[in-house]
Amino acid sequence: METRSSKTRRSLASRTNECQGTMWAPTSPPAGSSSPSQPTWKSSLYSSLAYSEAFHYSFAARPRRLTQLALAQRPEPQLLRLRPSSLRTQDISHLLTGVFRNLYSAEVIGDEVSASLIKARGSENERHEEFVDQLQQIRELYKQRLDEFEMLERHITQAQARAIAENERVMSQAGVQDLESLVRLPPVKSVSRWCIDSELLRKHHLISPEDYYTDTVPFHSAPKGISLPGCSKLTFSCEKRSVQKKELNKKLEDSCRKKLAEFEDELDHTVDSLTWNLTPKAKERTREPLKKASQPRNKNWMNHLRVPQRELDRLLLARMESRNHFLKNPRFFPPNTRYGGKSLVFPPKKPAPIGEFQSTEPEQSCADTPVFLAKPPIGFFTDYEIGPVYEMVIALQNTTTTSRYLRVLPPSTPYFALGLGMFPGKGGMVAPGMTCQYIVQFFPDCLGDFDDFILVETQSAHTLLIPLQARRPPPVLTLSPVLDCGYCLIGGVKMTRFICKNVGFSVGRFCIMPKTSWPPLSFKAIATVGFVEQPPFGILPSVFELAPGHAILVEVLFSPKSLGKAEQTFIIMCDNCQIKELVTIGIGQLIALDLIYISGEKSQPDPGELTDLTAQHFIRFEPENLRSTARKQLIIRNATHVELAFYWQIMKPNLQPLMPGETFSMDSIKCYPDKETAFSIMPRKGVLSPHTDHEFILSFSPHELRDFHSVLQMVLEEVPEPVSSEAESLGHSSYSVDDVIVLEIEVKGSVEPFQVLLEPYALIIPGENYIGINVKKAFKMWNNSKSPIRYLWGKISDCHIIEVEPGTGVIEPSEVGDFELNFTGGVPGPTSQDLLCEIEDSPSPVVLHIEAVFKGPALIINVSALQFGLLRLGQKATNSIQIRNVSQLPATWRMKESPVSLQERPEDVSPFDIEPSSGQLHSLGECRVDITLEALHCQHLETVLELEVENGAWSYLPVYAEVQKPHVYLQSSQVEVRNLYLGVPTKTTITLINGTLLPTQFHWGKLLGHQAEFCMVTVSPKHGLLGPSEECQLKLELTAHTQEELTHLALPCHVSGMKKPLVLGISGKPQGLQVAITISKESSDCSTEQWPGHPKELRLDFGSAVPLRTRVTRQLILTNRSPIRTRFSLKFEYFGSPQNSLSKKTSLPNMPPALLKTVRMQEHLAKREQLDFMESMLSHGKGAAFFPHFSQGMLGPYQQLCIDITGCANMWGEYWDNLICTVGDLLPEVIPVHMAAVGCPISSLRTTSYTIDQAQKEPAMRFGTQVSGGDTVTRTLRLNNSSPCDIRLDWETYVPEDKEDRLVELLVFYGPPFPLRDQAGNELVCPDTPEGGCLLWSPGPSSSSEFSHETDSSVEGSSSASNRVAQKLISVILQAHEGVPSGHLYCISPKQVVVPAGGSSTIYISFTPMVLSPEILHKVECTGYALGFMSLDSKVEREIPGKRHRLQDFAVGPLKLDLHSYVRPAQLSVELDYGGSMEFQCQASDLIPEQPCSGVLSELVTTHHLKLTNTTEIPHYFRLMVSRPFSVSQDGASQDHRAPGPGQKQECEEETASADKQLVLQAQENMLVNVSFSLSLELLSYQKLPADQTLPGVDIQQSASGEREMVFTQNLLLEYTNQTTQVVPLRAVVAVPELQLSTSWVDFGTCFVSQQRVREVYLMNLSGCRSYWTMLMGQQEPAKAAVAFRVSPNSGLLEARSANAPPTSIALQVFFTARSSELYESTMVVEGVLGEKSCTLRLRGQGSYDERYMLPHQP
């Protein structure tokens, strides 16, 4: 159906154009390939498996998958059609079927079916024939209607074309040629109604032009000639120079015809499937009429024959032809010949009519008639993915009436494949109208476009070309090819976002990479998740996927490093192998700001004026007043194209005087904010727009009266720091931003106060004015300021009324204001007032000073003061005064005493009587006033009388009077005499005072009281005269002769004029002798004070832990608290020392005097003197001694005497004594003395080496460093006993142990812990004796708990034989845990030793080194200690009751000896000379000599050197042992002593016995040992052993690259004489060859007999070792004498593989020659001489006598 085909083509063309309009810009694929070969990502595949009848005819046929091998069979007829799945289809058959079920069937008989039924008619079935007749009629009617439809459509199209041509012609005639482009002429009247056949339209029931044109057809006269307007006519010159448009059009038409003819010729010689899709009529329109060679040009002869003759001739010709006419087989004729068959596509040509008129339609060339027609004409694949295989069926239909053969050539590219054809019959022949089908397979490896073709060769001369195309709608991105990032500061980062949207019809994945990386070696290496960088640009994301209609933001980071434009090119690649360039551009800029304008006059600093060191600009404001504001306009230009965020900060200036040419240092620049500045700038912060001028207002608003000086700094926020080229080259660049000061403006401004001047500045009202009268005064105020002032006058209305008019207002600059002062006096007298005028915004007001004098009534008194003199008590006195009015105003007055004076006395009633007390005086009048005073109290009267005048000035009259009586008194009536001692006179002072102004006599009487006889009192002076208000000091001396308290003593004093005498009481307590005995608190634990009569506990304690042979001094203080002189004496009862201890002087050594004066000798002599002093003190042999430095003397009055008392001991124990102190007649004082001495009197040091005042620690016994398991080392130690007692030592050795779970030890003993033993160590039992014998053990109560079955008896007084302490049978001791007893490491002998008093004994300490484990490589510290528990065998030495007590055994601190040593393993220092380890690197190919023909070496020895060094101080004895394949030698002799191993025990014993040589290495010496490794073929054979049979120390390792190594590990043993060993690891790595074939089998396929075929196989060496290989041929099947397979070469040498290089290889040529038509199989094995793993190659080949398997160009 032509109409249907045309519609299909139109829809296809429109869709194809739409896809091409929106396709992503592709790039040309690489030369030599028809499709991209780069790997791409998978894209979504939209394909359908549904097929319909239109599959064979539709251009856009859907492909199918490989799993569907055949076309779906036609389903059974259905009543209803299903709705199509595609939303774009226009098929409405399902709707018609549902509505018109009876008229519209589901199945339609197509063109091919109906044509086949009509051609195949002739059936014997009448019904079928009737059906075919009806079908033929229907088809003819259908074609007739289609022809009519096409005729109507063609007629309408031609009519429209003619109307358009006529319109254009008319418009071109009416248009003006030179104004053609400027003037738009109106359209002409349409002529389409005259070009169309209205009757034809009405016949087919269509709308005609008469249906919508209502006007009648006008009558037109004959056409006139064309008349052009004058403006359109050409001038003479223009006509000469111009070319006629008709000529141009003619030339253009001629050229177009030539090109069209050439194009049609090309089309005539090109035959493909696209050409035959066109209808025959359409093609006939494009072709020129063909001329037949058989027809003569002169046809007039046909008109000369008569009709009967012509019919007769034709009849004869028909008879002649019927004899030779027979049906020929058109198969054997070419399809383009006469008998080659007719075309089923093109109708047969019509015979030309006879006559002058012939058909002008073009005829179809028989040579161009197609034989086969492809359906579809183009193999088109869409919506494919990577991986699946797609199929489509191409049907080739025979379009001729003859059965034809064909041959199809497959596609040339690997992406398309052609399956075997499916023919309708056997033999590969296609009947007329029948089709053969070929399955085309599509294997896409990417999502790009693919093009190929299939060639169909037939008997025709032209080949049918079927294009194969794969097109996937590409994604289309809206991303611009140029990404402009704009401007950015150098060192900064600017991010620009671009919207990237996929407006295509498929999903796409995209990858962005630098252009320099294109093409990449691997997409995985460049497909990063983050930014893709190409400095100074970075793009994110670098990999993204976009679905259709989706968008993503592409972020471009621009970080310029240099100034100017930066441009980089990126490649964005799609997964359909299409790429596109993206150009990123940006411009890097630096900050550039300019201050281009400052309003006002230009400011310059004055000469010598200090300015800011860093400011670029200077602005000075004119002096301004307070609270005023001055402004300046600043214009700052941002010269960059980048927005700059800024803010202003106001800082204090950096002022520093500089000499000419001197520069400042940056250290002197300080930045302090100016918080009290008067400057401000607006805006304070904001953003500077790119390349724009910005206006700022600088304001100066002073708020204080001073000069302001500040610096305005413009700070740009977050300005990036440019990276230097050095830092960028070193890779230290980092993005950092900071605020930068880019502009500094120094501003200055001064402030001046408001210049306000009052004229006059003070108003002085002359004369005196009476009160109540208003006084007016005028004045002026000038404003000399630079700004207007606003004033406000104050008011005064408290006493006077003062006002100014006007009170408020404004005075302009340099103007004056007139004011008037109103002053009304309210109080008489002069007044001075300051009237304030407040000036707005002025810190201080303007003051108008006013002075005036007002007066009222004035009264005066004739006297200045009133004196009454001295009065006696009860006396009255009267005085008179005169009051006179001196003013012209009447005055009302009143006089009284001042209330203030009454309150001061205090009195309620005034003693004055005033007559008259009040009255009124007329002007200039006078009156008398009498004032009377009555003396009622003794007092000194000073008061004031007030004269009150109404509205006038008051007057004051002072009054004086003195009223007294006689009075004398003592300052203190009781005297207590302190510090009164028996018989000692004591003086004190008393005071006698005269309380009046009258002179008075006094005298003292006798002492009164019942104790007056025991006392004597003397007063000096005894009598005298006291003047007015006199104080007299008297001396009183009292002597008491009794110690009773004085309480009843009185001394009288008689005074003239007083009725009773004065009495002085005397008291006091006489005291006796008082001496205080104290012990210094600083040196005694218990310090108390003893007072006579108040007994308290007093104790002299020298301490509870006094070290032996250490002086301890305490101070006894005697204080005489009375003025009585007395004697004293000190004495110890038992442990006293001789008094001549201090008198003994140490003899000086015999040496020069100069040497004796040195500091060292002086210290030595001082120590020796102290030792001699202690030896003298302890000479009595009691173990302890106490010595007072002053034993007796005189104690003066109030004297404090400090007496040093020294205590020391040379034997441990607790000592008690009494110190008897006797003072004068006081009772002797007994002071208990206590001292506990601790320490050990036994030491290994000499006595002279003891230190003073501190304990001496025993030096540690060091045994040095010993070898593990060595011999015992013994040290001798001499112990000295400095005590006066024999001391027994029982030794125990311990090892320290620090365990958190063991803190204390509980020791239980039965009997004494350390009994006496004989020399053999047996315990001795002997009776208790006080002096010597068996020891009675008594541990201290502080460290042990004792349990006994007997009751302890108390010991009182001295020791006696009857009071024996019962022996304790069981003792329990609890002590801190420090160590565990150990006797195997350290040992002391003898275990029990007695050191005599003042003598010495010798002990022996031995150390046995322990045996260390082999894991210990370093020396081990062995610490221990020995405790010598001290015991006293003499009971007297142990205890004297009440005097001393000495503990023993565990109760006393033992003698501790620290023992220290080191044990180190027998180990030598090993130094290796090969890479720091004893490792042998060998290759198995080392056994192959340079000439392989000479054979393979049996053994190869490699030697390394080992240096053994003895770094200790002791010699080492050792042997060297090692197993094969390693060996050792020293001094040329080989030693391969083997350690026992599997199968080598006997050999090891033999070699050890034969070479049992012990080596010795002295201290600090070294030895060189040779260690060898033997490589042999025997070792290489181990690699073939199974894994379970691999020998110990042998390991086979193979890397991922195929390299194979044998690793041998052994230990070199150094066996020392102490049965310890030292291990030196040995390792040998042998690289063995690893061969591999490139393939494991070779199949030659089917070959012609006796024809040799060759295949190449590569033999590769994967290891770093050479390989000598040979090829062995296996058994051949079938086994015949003639060998079918052979290899060349069959042996050779493969070099080692280099590091990081591909394996070395050699090409092996495998030859196969078939001897018969049989199947040949064989096996070849590649063997190596070094034990390599063999490689097997299986060979296979088939012989055949078929010549089609014969290779050309071979015999």
From Swiss-Prot:
An example GO CC term for this entry is: cytoplasm
Gene Ontology MF terms: alpha-tubulin binding; beta-tubulin binding; tubulin binding
Q: Using the UniProt annotation, give all residue ranges assigned to the region (Disordered).
A: 1-39, 1339-1360, 1529-1553
Q: In which residue ranges is the amino acid composition biased (Low complexity)?
A: 30-39
List, alphabetically, the Pfam families matched.
Ig_Dlec1_1, Ig_DLEC1_6th
Q: Give GO BP annotations, semicolon-separated.
A: cell differentiation; defense response to tumor cell; negative regulation of cell population proliferation; spermatogenesis
Chief localization: cytoplasm
**What Gene3D superfamilies has UniProt attached to this entry?**
Immunoglobulins (2.60.40.10)
Q: Which InterPro entries match?
A: DLEC1 (IPR033304), Ig-like_fold (IPR013783)
Q: Which body tissues produce this protein?
A: Expressed in all tissues examined. Expression is highest in prostate and testis.
**Cellular location(s):** Cytoplasm
**Keyword line:** Cytoplasm, Differentiation, Spermatogenesis, Tumor suppressor
Q: Which segments show compositional bias classed as Basic residues?
A: 1-12
| Assembly and oligomerization | Interacts with alpha- and beta-tubulin. Interacts with BBS2, BBS4, BBS5, MKKS, TCP1, CCT2, CCT3, CCT4, CCT5 and CCT7.
- Job of this protein: Essential for spermatogenesis and male fertility. May play an important role in sperm head and tail formation. May act as a tumor suppressor by inhibiting cell proliferation.
Disease link: DLEC1 silencing due to promoter methylation and aberrant transcription are implicated in the development of different cancers, including esophageal (ESCR), renal and lung cancers (LNCR). Lung cancer: A common malignancy affecting tissues of the lung. The most common form of lung cancer is non-small cell lung cancer (NSCLC) that can be divided into 3 major histologic subtypes: squamous cell carcinoma, adenocarcinoma, and large cell lung cancer. NSCLC is often diagnosed at an advanced stage and has a poor prognosis.
Q: What name has this protein been given in UniProt?
A: Deleted in lung and esophageal cancer protein 1
Organism field: Homo sapiens
The lineage, from the top, is: Eukaryota, Metazoa, Chordata, Craniata, Vertebrata
GN (gene name): DLEC1
